Structure formats: structure tokens, C-alpha cells
A protein has these predicted regions:
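Ser/Thr/Pro/Gly-rich low-complexity linker/stalk segments immediately outside membranes or between
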Residues: 29-49
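Conserved beta-strand positions
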Residues: 298, 520-522, 566, 645-647, ...
């Protein structure tokens, strides 16, 4: 008995000791233990020593010609003779650009690096090309590699800083008399016997100790760079060589080094059939530990269009967007958006707007021709930026920009405002790759079809199929979490909003009402509902009907030829702790600061974190992958044939824990493995939004963003992505009944050839009061079912046979009518205006659409 009492008394102390041990292991040791010095290769500096002979690559479709004195180049399409320049030819005469902006116009690369004071930008024109600190190699495979040393580098001239009097006189004798006098005027003779008379005696002895033994000529310290170049010519006249320079430099005890920020970056150019490819291997990047490189931008001015050019820039915003040349929107921000959205493993203290791109393509059309650039390698580190003429220079330009080393700020102490930046330990094992495709057309439809052809040629896409009928997606909200008062006490409870039996009734209503190609996404079916707990153990919610009710629903959906998918989130841990199998110390992803990624909802008023609400965690990728496997296995065991990933294929985040780093590219590969696993288990797959790397494994893409974020600099939204995918993949827009303007959302689906999407729940939406699920405010099924069935039936009947066809044309008429043309000649007219319109002899009612069949039908 006494022993048991002793154990119970000891238990709290054991818990405290365990907590302290965890604090030391996971916080104290990482923060205060000195890191093992990293072996970062030092940047190397080499100088261009070639001649001015152009460097040429050529094949049947393209020719590439580089000026070795600037590394500027042009790519010529042989069929059309159209030339694309790496940099504007007349940058120096730009009337708007100041000196720094002219340097940027002449750069083929720019980078951002950290300093003690913050960050700084460098371009490779001012800090490499102008100084000749680069080398050019024509490699065995025919590609051209340019190795840049970028930084404030003091140029090395082949002139001796110090030389013995004997050697000085010998070389001087080989010069003309006029040259001898000029040379001698730049040197001072120091002799051992006369050193005491020199004011800088100690400095001279420290730098040139041999002066104590013999007379030396020493270069004057105030010699200018221009004068050094002239002196180099004098020495060259005497036959002075690099070997001589090496001998004389041995007299120098201490030499100046390039102690500032210096970087090595290599760019590789190659021709691949009719495509031009540029690469930046990450293993070519060198930097000093004091100056981590954070961003890199290849070819920022490729194809830049002047104020005289006509055309537009294409950016992958939403389904696609155009920015007209010289549109005069200088009061608006320039364009920038992140590829695949935010990386949740990087900190943000406020969220004003969410930028995301689903497909890595940008392009430009001008003067009858165009190109698209596909960001093939290191894509997830990238973003797209674009700007118009008149802001910094007279050119319209766009390019890709890539994150290299990620960082976050660490608050050292609550007693000080000092913040320390902590960076990734090592460079990713990746290679930036950009593929430029040239199109003999300036129509965005042709640019989109070129991208579509590229997608179809990818090996993973060869087995994809598309439905004959336009798809319909219906999300049914199963259960939510809510604080419910029971016996006078607030209890965190699970509330059923659509039971499995009610879902059967809804599926029956829709299919019996004539809806075809119905895809049902059932969310909130396990682990406490929509904001589910982690899937370490998958438990079907009993309030919905339990496993028996779920099996009945699966069987019923099969009988009705409806595709049934069960939704789940695996990347986040909501309301999960040790009892649910989630341990933050070991299972949460980490920032570069080594802190766990803890996320709070953002306030819609202040845009800052709502830290009074419950947080949730970003799971480390391996933990998320394991939970996704548990979900897939559970569904297979219950006889389900469809899995709907709420995050995989849509969100993409890294884990910057230095002890187990998972880059964003590695996380992407893990997501692909998960989707392959689902396929191998016989599951169909739904993804949201449609990140390009997930396309081959998705049977349906829902919730595609057709609008984008609404950047003011954009002039026009276009269905670029949808044109590329139509006839290849089934896709839908965002839920019509949850949109701010339901008619507008429906009409956009018609214009973009997208399936229709709805979100329903059986219970009245009053149940959402006092919850965090107000986004379902318009999801009450009974309020929508008649209108939804009528809308779907009309749409599927009007669009019958078009889902498997490609889109061959698209245009927006001045009257506010969009016209989409399919391969059989069928035209779909969508009237966004408040008045009836007549276009091409076709009458389109206000805020409605009309389908005119092709081939005389």
C-alpha cells in the first residue's frame, strides 16, 4: 500500500521531468547548441578570356546565337524567321530607365540574398557581365553553359603589386621609352636602407616583408581601375605573362580578397527539337554562409516587348489571364503569384489575399507570334511575375522567380525585440528548368492548345479518359463539430448535417431527376466531421449511421450509377493530440526556426491570426502520407471505390526541420505516390483546384478557380487551362450555390466548358450558427434541389457530346458575350450583360447562354 502511495506521489514529478526533458531535447538543444560547421564550397571567380566569335547552336527548327562579350543571345524560329531576344537591344537608350534599371534590362539573371541588415538584390550584368567574371563552355551534348561569378569583385589585372628592382628593370628594358616613363610614374621604389624615412614603413613591411632584404617597386595604393587597365597594357608590351605575375605575387604577404557577397550561378542553354530550354542546376550555386541566397530569377527580360509592340502577356492566374502591353495601369501593383499557393511551413503573420497558381506556364504574344514558358524543374519553389512598360523602363516583361533557401524569423527573447533569421541548411537537390515553346500565332487559344499537346505527351497522361457527358459534382456535408449545451454544460459535440440515409435520398432525387455523370463527394464522414481528427485510426461517425449505414450508401450509389467519393484531409491535424495519435514534437512539420508549424484561423477584419481560437498543426509529410494510406485502406475495406483528397493535389507544404528536411519538391513526389497508391487500391480519385502534377491521377477535378484573385493590372480572364484540359480531364468550377453571384458562376462554367458543382446538406443551415462552418451558409438541399435538377438537366442536354471534344476557339466580344467553339464547329454563346444580345445572327437572352450546333445540327 505504501509503495502504491509512493508511486502516485512520484508520478507528477516524473511527468514534469519528462516535459523538461522534451523541452531541452526539442527546443534547448536545437537553439543553444552550436551547430556543426557546414562545408559550404566557397564561390570561385574566373574571367572570360575568349574572343568575340558568336557561340552558335542549331537544329532543324531553331538557331541560337550568343554574344560572348555580354552573354546576351537570340533564338530564331527558322520557319518564320522570328527572333526572340534575351534582352532588349536598345536598353541603353531607354528614356525612362535610370542607371540601375538599365542594368536590369541588360541582365540575364538576378538574385536576392540576405545581409545583416535585411536583403539585397544583384543582377548579373552589373556584378558579373560588365566585369567579365564569367566563363562559357560549349558542352559535349552541344549545350552552352555560362558560369557566372556575381558580386562586388575586384578585378585582377596582370600587373605586379610588388616586383624586385632587378625584374622591374629587366621588363622595363623591353618597353618603348615613352612607356617606360608612364610605367615608372605608377610605382614607388622602396629600398632597405631608406625605409626609415618612409611614413608608412610599418605598413609596407607588413605587406611586403621582402623589402627588408632587397629593393622593391610597389604599385601606388591610389591607382584607379582605369589606370590599372592601361598599366596592364604596358606590362603586356614587355612580354609579361600570368606566370610572371604568379612569381611576383609571392612578394605580397597579405592580399585583398573579395570578402563581400559573391555567388556562383550557372545557366545552361540547349535546343530540344522545336523547344528552347534553360537550366540552372542548384548544385552549381555557391554562396558564402553570411550571405544566403534566397531568390533567383532566370531570363527576366526574355522576349520583352517595347512600347511600339502590340500584344499581351499571359499569366496563369485562375484559368488564365492576359495583361495587355502598355495598358497604363501604373497605379496598380505589378503581378506576382506563388506556384501551388502558400507553403504553410513558412510563417505569415497576416493574410490579406491568397495567391496561388495551379499550372506552371506563362507566355507572351506579340506581332503575330508567341511563346509559352513551362516551368518544368523546381516548379514548386517558383512564382510568376510580370509588369508593364512605364513603371521602371519602357518594356513589358514577365518571368519566373524561384525561392532557393527558405527562412523565417526567430524571436530570441520576449525581453528584447531582436529577431534572428534562420535559413535552410542546404540547397535542394534540384534544377530549375524552363522550356520555351514557340507558336506561329498570337492567339491565346493556340498557346493553350500547345500546352495541352505538351500535357498529352507526358507518359503519365497517356491512359487518361474523359466522360461523354458533362460531369456534375455534389458535395454532401456529413457532420460538423459544434458546442452544444447539454444539461446546462457546453459540450464539444458532433452534429450530423447529412446522414448516410439522407444522402441516399439526395442521390435518388438527382439520378431519378435525370442527372447523369453524378459524382458525390461525401465530407465529414469520420473522426468528428469536416474538421476531422487525424486518420491514425479511421472511425466512421455513428451519428451518420455508422459503418453499416456507410456500406448501404456505397451499395445504393452503385445501383444508381453514381460515383461516390469520401473526402478527407491529411496534411493538417485538427483537434488532435496524443490520445488521437498526434504528438506535436514528432509529428508536426517545422519552420526553419525549428518551431512547430502551429496555425490559427485568420481574422477577416484585421487579416491577422485569431489567436483566441483553437490552432491546428501542419503535419510532416511522412505523417500525412501514412494517414492518407490509412484512409485509403479503410475505404477499400468498406467497399468504397472513390477517395476525394481535400488537400493532396491542391495544397503543398514542406517541412524545414533540419534533422529531417523534406523540400516542397519532395513533398510533391510523396503526394504523387499517395495518389498512385489510391489508384492501385482500385479507388477513383477527386482532387480540388487541379495542380498540374496531380492531373494524371485524378478522375475528376473539382473547385477549379475560373477567376483568379482579381489583380487590377489584369485586363482579361481567359480559359487557358481549361482549353488545354478539355477533352482530356473532367473538371468542374466552384460550388454554384455558395458563390456570391450564382448566375455569374454558372455562366462561367458554361463559357469554360466546366462541369457543374454544388454543395448540399440535409439539415437547415441554422445548425451552422455558433460554428466555424459558416461557409456552408447556402447549402440547404431542400432550398436548391428543384432549381439544381432543372439547371443540370438543361446544361447536360445543351452540352451533350462536347465534353470529349477539344476547344478550338474562344473570344470575348465587345457586347459582353463570350463565344467558345468546339472541334465539331459547335459554338456556345454566353451573355454576361443585362440585355439581350445578338451575335453572329444568334440571339442570346440576358444573363444566359445559347448553344449553336456545328455540322449543320
Amino acid at each position: 500500500m505504501k509503495k502504491k502511495k509512493f508511486i502516485w506521489r512520484l508520478l507528477p514529478w516524473l511527468i514534469v521531468l519528462a516535459a523538461l526533458a522534451a523541452l531541452v531535447v526539442f527546443v534547448g538543444i536545437p537553439l543553444f547548441t552550436p551547430e556543426v560547421p557546414r562545408d559550404i564550397p566557397a564561390p570561385q571567380v574566373a574571367y572570360f578570356e575568349g574572343d568575340e566569335t558568336p557561340i552558335i547552336m542549331e537544329n532543324d527548327a531553331l538557331s541560337f546565337e550568343m554574344d560572348p562579350t555580354t552573354t546576351h543571345f537570340k533564338v530564331t524560329e527558322k520557319a518564320s524567321g522570328r527572333e526572340w531576344l534575351s534582352n532588349p537591344a536598345d536598353a541603353d537608350s531607354d528614356p525612362i530607365a535610370v542607371a540601375a534599371n538599365k542594368e536590369m534590362l541588360k541582365a540575364t539573371l538576378s538574385l536576392t540574398h540576405a545581409t545583416q541588415a535585411g536583403v539585397a538584390d544583384m543582377n548579373n550584368y552589373k556584378y558579373s557581365i560588365e566585369n567579365g567574371t564569367y566563363t562559357i563552355e560549349q558542352q559535349e551534348d552541344g549545350s552552352v553553359r555560362v558560369n557566372y561569378a556575381i558580386g562586388k569583385i575586384e578585378k585582377i589585372y596582370m600587373i605586379p603589386t610588388a616586383i624586385t628592382k632587378e625584374r622591374f628593370d629587366t621588363f622595363k628594358a623591353e618597353m618603348k621609352k615613352s612607356t617606360q616613363k608612364k610605367l615608372t610614374s605608377n610605382y614607388t621604389l622602396y629600398e632597405p636602407a631608406k625605409l626609415d624615412s618612409k611614413k608608412n614603413k610599418d605598413e609596407i613591411i607588413a605587406m611586403y616583408p621582402e623589402v627588408l632584404n632587397q629593393a622593391l617597386y610597389i604599385l601606388k595604393s591610389d591607382t584607379s581601375e582605369n589606370n590599372k587597365a592601361k598599366i596592364e597594357g604596358y606590362w603586356a608590351e614587355s612580354g609579361y605573362t600570368a606566370e610572371d605575375y604568379a612569381i611576383d605575387q609571392q612578394l605580397v604577404a597579405g592580399s585583398k580578397d573579395n570578402s563581400g557577397a559573391v555567388f556562383n550561378v550557372s545557366m545552361v542553354y540547349r535546343l530540344d527539337g522545336s523547344d528552347f530550354v534553360v537550366e540552372i542546376p542548384y548544385d552549381s550555386i555557391r554562396y558564402k554562409e553570411a550571405y544566403p541566397i534566397t531568390f533567383i530569377t532566370p531570363l527576366p527580360m526574355f522576349g520583352a516587348a517595347s512600347v511600339e509592340d502590340e500584344g499581351y502577356m499571359f499569366v496563369p492566374e485562375g484559368g488564365g489571364a492576359l495583361i495587355n502591353f502598355n495598358n497604363g495601369k501604373l497605379n496598380q501593383n505589378s503581378y506576382y503569384a506563388n506556384m501551388y499557393g502558400w507553403d504553410y511551413a513558412t510563417r505569415r503573420n497576416e493574410m490579406i489575399s491568397e495567391t496561388r497558381l495551379n499550372f506552371p506556364v506563362f507566355g507572351m504574344a506579340k506581332n503575330g507570334g508567341s511563346f509559352i514558358c513551362i516551368m518544368e524543374g523546381a516548379t514548386s519553389y517558383g512564382g510568376v511575375m510580370a509588369d508593364i512598360s512605364g513603371r521602371y523602363n519602357s518594356y513589358n516583361w514577365l518571368c519566373g522567380k524561384y525561392n532557393v533557401l527558405h527562412s523565417d524569423q526567430y524571436n530570441v527573447s520576449s525581453k528584447t525585440a531582436q529577431l534572428v533569421f534562420m535559413y535552410e541548411q542546404d540547397l535542394p537537390d534540384d534544377c530549375i528548368t524552363q522550356r520555351y515553346k514557340f507558336i506561329d500565332s498570337d492567339r491565346y487559344v493556340d498557346m493553350a492548345n500547345a500546352y495541352g499537346e505538351y500535357l498529352r505527351q507526358q507518359p503519365e497522361m497517356t491512359a487518361t479518359t474523359v466522360s461523354e457527358q458533362m460531369p456534375v459534382s455534389v458535395e454532401m456535408v456529413g457532420a460538423i463539430d459544434k458546442i452544444v449545451v447539454k444539461m446546462g454544460l457546453p459540450i464539444d459535440s458532433v452534429v450530423a448535417t447529412t446522414t448516410f440515409e439522407q444522402a441516399q435520398q439526395m442521390i435518388g432525387d438527382l439520378t431519378e431527376g435525370g442527372v447523369e455523370n453524378l459524382n458525390v463527394r461525401f465530407s465529414g464522414w469520420a473522426n468528428r466531421g469536416v474538421n476531422q481528427r487525424v486518420f491514425t485510426d479511421v472511425k466512421v461517425i455513428k451519428q451518420l449511421g455508422g459503418e453499416a449505414g456507410m456500406k448501404n450508401l456505397i451499395s445504393f450509389a452503385k445501383d444508381k450509377n453514381a460515383n461516390l467519393y469520401f473526402d478527407g484531409v491529411n496534411c493538417f491535424a485538427y483537434d488532435s493530440g496524443i490520445l488521437q495519435g498526434f504528438v506535436g514534437f514528432s509529428d508536426a512539420a517545422r519552420y526553419t526556426t525549428r518551431e512547430q508549424v502551429k496555425i490559427y484561423p485568420y481574422d477577416i477584419i484585421t487579416y491577422k491570426e485569431s489567436d483566441w481560437l483553437d490552432p491546428y498543426y501542419l503535419a510532416k509529410p511522412s505523417y500525412a502520407k501514412e494517414n492518407a494510406s490509412n484512409m485509403i485502406n479503410k475505404l477499400s475495406g468498406l467497399g468504397a471505390e472513390g477517395v476525394a483528397f481535400r488537400d493532396i493535389g491542391f495544397l503543398l507544404s514542406a517541412d524545414y526541420n533540419p534533422k529531417a528536411l523534406v523540400t516542397r519538391e519532395e513533398a510533391k513526389a510523396m503526394n504523387v505516390e499517395t495518389m498512385k497508391e489510391a489508384q492501385a487500391a482500385g479507388q477513383k480519385v477527386i482532387i480540388r483546384s487541379g495542380n498540374d502534377y496531380a492531373l494524371p491521377y485524378a478522375d475528376l477535378i473539382t473547385d477549379m478557380d475560373l477567376n483568379g484573385a482579381g489583380y487590377a493590372i489584369v485586363d482579361k480572364n481567359v480559359p487557358f487551362y481549361q482549353i488545354a484540359l478539355h477533352g482530356v480531364k473532367d473538371y468542374t468550377g466552384e460550388p454554384i450555390n455558395l458563390a456570391n453571384d450564382t448566375v455569374e458562376q454558372f455562366l462561367q462554367c458554361v463559357e469554360y466548358g466546366a462541369g457543374l458543382n454544388y454543395t448540399f446538406m440535409a439539415m437547415d443551415t441554422k445548425v451552422l450558427q455558433d460554428t466555424l462552418h459558416s461557409g456552408f451558409y447556402a447549402a440547404h438541399y431542400d432550398s436548391w434541389k428543384e432549381d439544381a435538377v432543372a439547371t443540370i438537366n438543361r446544361y447536360q442536354e445543351d452540352m451533350a457530346g462536347l465534353n470529349q471534344q477539344s476547344i478550338v476557339d474562344h473570344e470575348m466580344r465587345d457586347s459582353g458575350v463570350a463565344v467558345t467553339t468546339y472541334e465539331d464547329g459547335t459554338k456556345v454563346y454566353v451573355n454576361y450583360s443585362e440585355r439581350m444580345r445578338r451575335v453572329d445572327g444568334v440571339t442570346i437572352p440576358a444573363r444566359d447562354y445559347t448553344v449553336e450546333r456545328g455540322n449543320g445540327k
